[in-house]
Design a protein with these regions (language model features):
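Preference for bulky hydrophobic residues occupying beta-strand positions
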Residues: 34, 79-81, 113, 203-205, ...
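HotDog/MaoC-like acyl-thioester-processing domains
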Residues: 62, 74, 87-92, 100-165, ...
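Short coil/loop residues immediately preceding or within conserved phosphate-binding loops
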Residues: 17, 76-78, 110, 188, ...
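Hot-dog-fold acyl-thioester-processing enzymes
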Residues: 6-10, 14-17, 28-63, 73, ...
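Structured core of small recognition/catalytic domains
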Residues: 175-257
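Non-catalytic linker/capping segments at the edges of enzyme domains
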Residues: 1-39, 137-208
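Residue-level preference for beta-strand/loop junctions
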Residues: 14, 26-28, 73-75, 91, ...
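Hydrophobic beta-strand-centered segment that forms part of the acyl-chain substrate-binding groove
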Residues: 61-94, 232-265
Length: 311
């Protein structure tokens, strides 16, 4: 474990863990940057949409929050991220968003934005719907319960040459059994794969205090990360040796907000339809007794050449 000293009511643990920094946030919009790299790679050693889920949520949520009346508490109810240029394996990405519709009478709004890489190429497009809520701020969770924030150690990635000749289903079965490393990002979010078959996976993730937003629930960007990881794994169960996949989008409806000090979250991802080049995927995050928390949809490009070195 790595310890980072946190001044009371100072550093936001969520953004500290995810390497995110605030550049600006005002009525004109919000801008954040994130240092991406191996700590946020999937099991293939690649940066994915899930790697930038938190900074994406920060941007669209921050833009709405900054546009709302002072003192408001806000939550994102729907988050959509669409891939454009490949995300870099390492470096700096910048997420910026602004409010495109604001209805203070009903307490709702729509924000749009984008993520750009270090070369100023658009790597992802963002859209969110947010609401003003009356929930109390959970400062003791959002800013950490103690003077030190413990950051989980970075987990390993299985060398690409050990995976290149394997069918995708075998790789994902290996992750479930522990023969293949689940990757740093899954390790960071606590995503554990428990059962696998072609076109379906199930597992769980355990919330942690560092994942908290201002109202003490798991930030939507963390949930996007988990949903994207699950969608990628189920897409990989369809791939042949020497080929891989790329998730092209993530569309999340955030139905209920899981508490960071709550029970494990169940994760189930299924292929709805798969063609030769594209798979449509649905992922559900639920409570242990089956109550829906997140409904997510994704599409994944299949048949891409295997590349374990990121982009």
């Amino acid at each position: 474990m790595t310890s980072v000293t946190v001044a009371p009511l100072g550093i936001d643990p969520l953004n500290t863990v995810m390497g995110v920094r605030t550049l600006s946030m005002n009525a004109a919009g919000a801008r954040f940057e994130q240092s991406v790299g191996p700590r946020f790679h999937d099991h293939r050693g690649q940066t994915t949409l899930g790697s930038v889920g938190v900074v994406a949520d920060d941007a669209v949520a921050g833009a709405f929050y900054a546009s709302a009346p002072a003192g408001s508490r806000t939550v994102v109810s729907q988050l959509v991220v669409t891939a454009a240029a490949p995300l870099p394996a390492s470096g700096i990405v910048t997420a910026a968003a602004s409010a495109t519709h604001l209805d203070l009478e009903t307490g709702t709004g729509v924000t749009d934005g984008e993520i750009r890489d270090g070369g100023d190429r658009v790597a992802a497009m963002l859209r969110a719907r947010s609401f003003i809520v009356s929930r109390p701020v959970r400062t003791e969770l959002h800013y950490g319960p103690a003077a030190e924030l413990v950051i989980p150690e970075q987990e390993e990635t299985t060398p690409a040459d050990e995976l290149a000749a394997l069918p995708g289903l075998t790789i994902v079965e290996g992750i479930a059994s522990g023969r293949v490393h689940r990757g740093p990002l899954a390790g960071l979010t606590g995503l554990a794969v428990e059962s696998v078959s072609r076109g379906t996976i199930s597992g769980s993730m355990t919330p942690s205090n560092w994942m908290s937003n201002a109202v003490g629930t798991v930030q939507g960007g963390v949930l996007l990360t988990v949903a994207d990881l699950a969608a990628g794994l189920v897409a990989q169960t369809l791939t042949e040796p020497g080929t891989s996949f790329r998730t092209l989008d993530a569309h999340l409806d955030l139905v209920r907000s899981p508490a960071v000090d709550g029970p494990p979250i169940r994760v189930k991802s299924d292929v709805v339809r798969a063609g030769r080049r594209l798979a449509l995927i649905e992922t559900r995050l639920t409570t242990p007794d089956g109550q829906l928390l997140v409904s997510a949809r994704a599409s994944a490009q299949l048949g891409r050449p295997h590349d374990g070195a990121g982009r």
